[in-house]
A protein has these predicted regions:
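Intrinsic disorder/low-complexity segments
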Residues: 2-4, 8
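Intrinsically disordered, low-complexity segments enriched in serine/proline and basic residues
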Residues: 8-17
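Short low-complexity, flexible loop/linker segments enriched in glycine and/or proline
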Residues: 61-67, 170-172, 266-267
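Short glycine-rich phosphate-binding loop at a beta-alpha junction
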Residues: 155-160, 250
Length: 306
């Protein structure tokens, strides 16, 4: 997704979003887009169109994550940061619609130096989510379009937001954003210091982070003492992914980025031949009564601007 997986921030394993090395042909992007669109349309997805700019009527929306500008007439506009948020907003305004859509276009964010960065996204969303088959079809489109165009060796990390939510439910909300940032960095000593500094019990969180290094095999699921329904979902997802030649599946329940927006299984795709983060997504909450599922392929600006 991203949709809502902010995978263009810091990245697991030190990987950057997908890009090309010097001298590699941009024909691969063309092949990727064609393959993605063909796969999406063959599965019944329809094109979703949305402007890159939106009138900023509520000034309380302005924060460090919002890229905005003032037009000549004085009005404030914000640039699209995330497609999934736009699709969720559309669905909530039109709740009778069933959305099975694909999209392509640019999103904008600030980097660590305060400069605006562009990322091209190819993604798809299903709202409402009805069954694990919805997750499978999203993954099918992502995996097959990537294997047909970019690489023949993928690592897919599978997690579940409910696992880490259970570990942090006792942590005061004022500490959670920073805590999840530390979990993403997987620095055990930094987490221990944070726990000591703020008098927090983070032993379950630390176990998850440590397990992300030592217990990544799907055969070790029993060691996590998961709720049976969660374990069953993960097993079904792993079984589905394992049928693809060239795909390696590992478990990482410490995947914490935007955990507050997810509600269930999550996934990240990495290229193993030319290490890079390629795609991410998962199941998320649309409103109090509705879930959705989606996934997004990321292509950074340096890929096409050379």
């Amino acid at each position: 997704m991203v949709g809502i997986w902010k995978a263009t921030g810091s990245h697991p394993k030190g990987c950057d979003p997908f890009s090309f090395k010097e001298g590699k042909s941009l024909k691969r992007i063309d092949k990727l887009v064609r393959s993605f669109v063909n796969e999406a349309m063959s599965e019944g997805f329809e094109l979703f169109l949305s402007p890159e700019t939106e009138v900023l009527r509520d000034l309380s929306q302005i924060n460090d994550d919002v890229v905005f500008f003032q037009a000549k007439g004085g009005g404030l506009f914000k640039l699209r940061r995330d497609y999934t948020a736009t699709i969720v907003e559309f669905y909530n305004k039109n709740p009778s619609d069933t959305l099975r859509v694909w999209y392509s276009g640019f999103v904008y964010r600030y980097d660590q130096t305060g400069q605006i960065q562009n990322t091209f996204q190819l993604g798809l969303e299903i709202v409402p989510y009805n069954s694990p088959q919805d997750s499978f079809v999203v993954l099918k489109v992502l995996i097959e379009s990537v294997l047909n165009s970019l690489t023949d060796k993928l690592l897919i990390e599978v997690g579940d937001s409910r696992v880490i939510e259970r570990c942090i439910q006792h942590v005061p909300k004022k500490f959670r954003k920073k805590l999840l940032e530390l979990v993403d960095r997987k620095d055990v000593s930094e987490l221990e210091f944070f726990a000591s500094l703020n008098n927090l019990d983070l032993k379950d969180v630390l176990k998850l982070v440590e397990a992300s290094f030592t217990k990544r095999s799907v055969n070790q699921l029993k060691e996590f003492e998961l709720d049976p329904s969660i374990e069953r979902e993960i097993v079904e997802l792993v079984e589905f992914l394992s049928k693809y030649p060239g795909v390696t599946v590992e478990i990482d329940f410490s995947l914490a980025r935007t955990v507050e927006e997810y509600d269930g299984p999550t996934f990240i795709l990495f290229d193993l031949k030319d290490p890079a983060l390629i795609a991410a997504g998962g199941r998320y909450r649309v409103n109090e009564n509705t879930l959705g599922v989606g996934g997004t392929i990321f292509v950074e600006e340096r890929t096409w601007s050379r």
